Each structure stands twice: as structure tokens, then as C-alpha cells.
């Protein structure tokens, strides 16, 4: 008798993806973040759906509808804070997932990596538009500042900004379309995740050694299903601790003030997960230059497969590259800190140095270290 799991047209897709999938026997906890990101996406779509049932995308009522969710809807406060802090957990997992790919050379799976970069852009766009929806001070001014950056594009810039705004300033039309995009994008992201997995399953997973693991594979279930379950337990514990004990830890107090176009907050800054890119944007005195640096700070990830000059795939056996990688991580922490500081001395200088170091490490120092390590292999 044939097993339904292996013959049913739909169930066999799940079987080949999560049950009988051959996986390397030595993948570490760094490979848990894919499933955690899937969980984060599911949490965000689910909590977002329930929030959308009570939210009104109108400048007059948006702020009070969020207040209504927190005060009057059954467990509305829980749903709202799970959604807000779920975004933070999403980005923590994202950064760790991308960092893992950089460290272990997973970017040599060209299609999987590039779909991943597109996913990163889509998630950043979704998070930005979601931040605008509560219509607090930081929502309004964040939307104004970031959309205004497009005016730096020569010739069509101003027209483009007014087209996105749906008027001459961020107003009702902007809020309505941002809500529409914020609702539809997660489903597009879910579809892209399927493509991401499709390309990954064409090649199979990478592993910490960076070596071909075809001779030593184990089934995904039960080994990695139980391992993922442990990761999920940790993630939910962290998320619920944040939600139930300090839900506003990562938010901005200014967003508890309703949006007022006549009063600019003293320090306009995005959510913490955008601060590194915001610091790079601010470190260049020219508007167009800043916008290009901002876009390129993420787009540079697509160059990783081209900049890989080492004879070894993973950094596991490359101490020089390891050192430089961790300097890059420290640099990103520095940029995140600077992004939240006011634009004054010494923060401007620190931000500029950190920005130069960020691009230098990726474009020059890491490839140079790879060449040195190649030479050392011959000695």
C-alpha cells in the first residue's frame, strides 16, 4: 500500500519540504531562523488581520481607533503589542538569518540569496508603512521625511513624491493607500517565501563547514522539526516577555501624541531596526547622495556572491575573515546607536566613519582578506 503522504498531490509537497527533506546532519542553531521567520510572518498576518477588523484608515479616526483597540476590544492591547513587537522579533531574526548567510557563504546559492534580498526590501517597506498607520507624531513625520527623500531623484522627484502622497502633503489619501499596501504586502511576501524555499530545495541547505554534504544527510523530520520547535519556544518566550512586561520598550513616546502637521518633533527617527540605514543616510551631507547610500546599504548584499574570492565557502576555517566579519557586526551596532542620536558633534563624525567602514569592509577589506587567506593555504 502506498503512503498518502508520498502520493497525494498537495501533501507530497509538504512531505518533500518538511518531512522527508534530506538535510545536512551538522547544521547548527543558526539554521533555525528560517522557520522562526516563517512563524513571525504567520504571527504578523494573524494579529494584523484582527487589528484591521477594528482599525480605520482615516486621519480623523486612525489614532483613536488604535486607542479603542487597546482599551475596548477584548485582548486588543495584546494583539496590538504582539503585532508591534512581533515586527521587532521579525527583524532580529532577519538580521541573524542574513548574518548567518554572510558568515557561512550561503550567498553562493545565487537565486535563493537574491530572492532573500528582495524579501528584505519588501519586509522593510511593509514595516515602514505599518509604522505610519497609528497616525502618531512619529508616524506622520517619519512618513513625511522618508517619502520626501524621493524628491532627490532628478527631474521626476517632486512629481513622484506628490503622486505617492496623493496630494501636496502627507494626508488622508496617503494613510489610506499605506493601509492598503500594508495589508497586501505580507501576502506577496508569503508568496516570495515560497519561491525562496523552492530555490533552496533545488540545491539543498548549506552547512557550517561549507562542504558538500550529500554523503551525510538525515531526514528533516523528526530531527529538525524538534529542533525548530525548541527555537519556536524560545522566540515565543522572548516575544511574550516583551509584550507582557515592557511593550513600549522599543517604541517611541512621541507616537502617543496624535499627528500634528504644525508641530515637528525635536528628533525624527524611525524604528530601531532602520536606524543603521538612517545613520548611513544622514552621514552624507548631499540629499541624493544620502538616498543612494541608503538604498545601496541594503542592495550591497546582492554583490556578496560576486565579491566572494576565497577558495573556501564558509568562514569557519578563515580566522582573518572571521575577525573582519565581527568588526562589521560591531560597526552595524555603532550605526544603529548613531541613528538614534541627534545630529551634532561628535555623533556626525562617528556616523560618517562608521558608514565609510561599513562599505569598505564589504567592498574592499573582506575580499582582500580572502585573497590573503588563499595565499596562506599554499604555505
From Swiss-Prot:
The chain crosses the membrane at residues 33-53, 77-98, 113-133, 178-198, 226-246, 288-308, 320-340, 347-367. Its main location: mitochondrion. Binds 2 heme b groups non-covalently. GO terms for molecular function: metal ion binding; ubiquinol-cytochrome-c reductase activity. A ubiquinone binds at residue 201. The keyword Electron transport applies. Heme b b566 binds at residues 97, 196. Its cofactor is heme b. InterPro entries: Cyt_b/b6_C, Cyt_b/b6_C_sf, Cyt_b/b6_N, Cytb/b6-like_sf, Cytochrome_b, Cytochrome_b_C_euk/bac, Cytochrome_b_N_euk/bac, Di-haem_cyt_TM. GO terms for cellular component: mitochondrial inner membrane; respiratory chain complex III. It is found in: Mitochondrion inner membrane. Heme b b562 binds at residues 83, 182. Heme 1 (or BL or b562) is low-potential and absorbs at about 562 nm, and heme 2 (or BH or b566) is high-potential and absorbs at about 566 nm. PANTHER family: CYTOCHROME B. This is Cytochrome b. The lineage of its organism: Eukaryota, Metazoa, Chordata, Craniata, Vertebrata. The gene is MT-CYB.
